Curated annotation (Swiss-Prot):
InterPro entries: Aldolase_TIM, Elp3/MiaA/NifB-like_rSAM, MoaA, MoaA_NifB_PqqE_Fe-S-bd_CS, MoaA_twitch, MoCo_biosynth_MoaA/MoaC, rSAM. PROSITE patterns: MOAA_NIFB_PQQE (PS01305), RADICAL_SAM (PS51918). Its cofactor is [4Fe-4S] cluster. Residues 8-227 form the Radical SAM core domain. It comes from Brevibacillus brevis (strain 47 / JCM 6285 / NBRC 100599). Monomer and homodimer. GTP binds at R17, R71, T102, K163, R266, A267, R268. Keywords: 4Fe-4S, GTP-binding, Iron, Iron-sulfur, Lyase, Metal-binding, Molybdenum cofactor biosynthesis, Nucleotide-binding, S-adenosyl-L-methionine. This is GTP 3',8-cyclase. S-adenosyl-L-methionine binds at Y30, G75, S126, M197. It is an enzyme of class 4 (lyase). GO terms for molecular function: 4 iron, 4 sulfur cluster binding; cyclic pyranopterin monophosphate synthase activity; GTP 3',8'-cyclase activity; GTP binding; metal ion binding; S-adenosyl-L-methionine binding. HAMAP family: MoaA_B (MF_01225_B).
Length: 339
């Protein structure tokens, strides 16, 4: 039986998000804007990235503390060479119940079959518009929508479970809410709408660009009636709705207007081995050094336990309460820890 570890607010450690690279082939403005992450930007050298063996070892230690769900992130995780091999290694870890991956989808058609065969269960594809011109502007590199839709089709054919994430920004892509809902309802994939968040320090976040989830629900409900659905499990971040008369669902991730800090069970491991206890964290705890310095599994396990047991973060709740000085706090970039 895995040990149970709780933070200062009695939140268990259940989910581990593992970033495998800080690189991405997109330059989305809310994550990795091109004016900051330009040609001269210095990404992590290979020597500083956790190896697959180190990631697998840490995964084993995390599962001994109660983690059952693993999500592979980036950057863009498919830019890490031989990623299916890592999936295979994690799949063999006792206690791992579910392996998912978040991707921009542009490289998915090349790798979906190998990922499925290696043991990947699910994939979440980030897609913010079906309009080619707008999508090219949003991804900052002129990628076309078809490259992502092709990846989704190949992944579905391979047998991967698929969800789509759409970050909604008022005045940027809010006109795409209904077209996205119609399209993915027809395709049979769950579409999740995410409120534009103040992650990192470089995405130019403004509160007036947030489209509240309740507004999105109202907009869709007027055309395609929705019925609220119960959560699947403790700590589920998305509020779920199904289309009336069907089992097809949408989800709403309302991290700005309806903070879910009180049930957050996620830890985040960056590509170079720092452990972050919140998406909005200012700093992380280094696990790479103890791994490479010869610490035993038990020593690293107790280090992780201590980090989680002193966890007291609730950034989104503090944002809602307008905590003084919150907007001046430095935060890790989302591209570094995978959202």
């Amino acid at each position: 039986m895995p040990d149970k570890v709780l933070d200062l607010r009695n939140r268990p450690l259940r989910d581990l998000r593992i970033s495998v690279t800080d690189k991405c082939n997109f330059r989305c403005r809310y994550c990795m804007p091109a004016d900051i992450f330009g040609p001269d930007f210095e990404f992590l050298p290979q020597s500083k990235l956790l190896t697959f063996e180190e990631i697998t070892r840490l995964t084993q230690i995390f599962t001994s503390l109660g983690v059952g769900k693993i999500r592979i992130t980036g950057g863009e995780p498919l830019m890490r060479r031989n990623l299916p091999e890592l999936i295979r290694m994690i799949r063999e870890v006792e206690g791992v119940q579910d392996i998912a991956m978040t991707t921009n989808g542009s490289l998915l058609s090349r790798h979906a079959q190998a990922l499925k065969e290696a043991g990947l269960d699910r994939v979440t594809v980030s897609l913010d518009s079906l309009d080619n011109e707008r999508f090219g502007m949003l991804n900052g590199r002129g990628y076309q929508v078809d490259s992502v839709l092709d990846g989704i089709r190949v992944a579905a054919d391979a047998g991967l479970s698929i969800k789509i994430n759409m970050v909604v920004q008022r005045g940027v892509n809010d006109q795409d809410i209904l077209p996205m809902a119609r399209y993915f309802r027809e395709q049979g994939h769950t579409l999740r709408f995410i409120e534009f968040m103040d992650v990192g320090n470089s995405n130019g976040w403004r509160l007036d660009q947030v489209v509240p989830s309740r507004e999105i629900v109202r907009m869709i409900h007027e055309e395609m009636p929705l019925v609220a659905t119960e959560a699947n499990y403790y700590g589920e971040v998305a509020s779920r709705y199904r289309y009336e008369g069907s089992n097809q669902e949408i989800g709403l991730i309302s991290s700005v207007t309806q903070a879910f800090c009180s049930t957050c069970t996620r830890a985040r491991l960056s590509a170079e081995g720092k452990l972050y206890n919140c998406l909005f964290a200012s700093s992380g705890d280094d696990l790479r050094e103890p791994v490479r310095d010869g610490r035993t599994d038990e020593e690293i396990r107790e280090l992780i336990r201590a980090i989680w047991e002193r966890r007291d973060v609730r950034y989104s709740e503090e944002r809602l309460s307008e905590t003084p000085g919150l907007d001046k706090r430095e935060k890790v970039e989302m591209s570094h820890i995978g959202g």
